[in-house]
Amino acid sequence: MGLRSFVIPAVDIKDGKAVRLYKGDPEAVTVYGDDPVSVAKQWEEKGAKHLHIVDLDGAFEGKPKNIDIVKDIVKTVSIPVEFGGGLRSFEAVKSIVETGVERVVIGSLAYQNRQEFERIVSAYPGKVIVGIDAKDGKVAIKGWLEKTEYTPLDFARMFDDLDIWGFLYTDVNRDGAMVGPNIEGTKYLAQNLKHPVIASGGVGSVEDLKKLYDLKKYGVYGVVVGKALYEGKIKLEQLED
């Protein structure tokens, strides 16, 4: 697997458009396309091997709001899609899995309702990614609005024995800021967990990608990249496959 396969392009949906937030702030929005479906297709055409879809309206409102767009994306592309944003009940997860997405990212619910979370994992073994959003070294939930007392590793260890797919580790302070990823934090997490870790937040250059790619041996599976792809700092089609 080369660098290109390691990159998971992000398509963040807000108000029906493909956007990017700066450091998780719902007011700091850049719109990159009016049609998220064609944006998703474009990444596939440029050689993406998987996609990361986020329903930002869902994340802030607590339930998925853009299911039809997700359905259209899954129908249009032939690569696996992972989805996150507002999955805070079994029903919400069921409705998203039925669109044909490969994996679902769950953060707040895992923390707030263990029983419901375990029910989801039992129903969809190997399909659930636990989302770990870290803000100032502690895990944040509810669309990054509320901080918990857990460190990322303490939080992850609560779920590492379940039949999940793995973890998505986002450093919110770096997200959309292209200041470089949290290499140490990502490595530390991956080294200490049984399941794979997907990194996210802060990637701004091919150099950053290579640093994360070097962590594959510790269990880092890939990296979600948004802004750096949209701003042309990283050209997917130019990365080795």
Swiss-Prot record:
The gene is hisA. It catalyses: 1-(5-phospho-beta-D-ribosyl)-5-[(5-phospho-beta-D-ribosylamino)methylideneamino]imidazole-4-carboxamide = 5-[(5-phospho-1-deoxy-D-ribulos-1-ylimino)methylamino]-1-(5-phospho-beta-D-ribosyl)imidazole-4-carboxamide. GO terms for molecular function: 1-(5-phosphoribosyl)-5-[(5-phosphoribosylamino)methylideneamino]imidazole-4-carboxamide isomerase activity. Keywords: Amino-acid biosynthesis, Cytoplasm, Histidine biosynthesis, Isomerase. It is found in: Cytoplasm. The active site is at 12 (proton acceptor), 133 (proton donor). GO terms for cellular component: cytoplasm. The keyword DNA-binding does not apply. Its EC number is 5.3.1.16. This is 1-(5-phosphoribosyl)-5-[(5-phosphoribosylamino)methylideneamino] imidazole-4-carboxamide isomerase. The keyword Amino-acid biosynthesis applies.
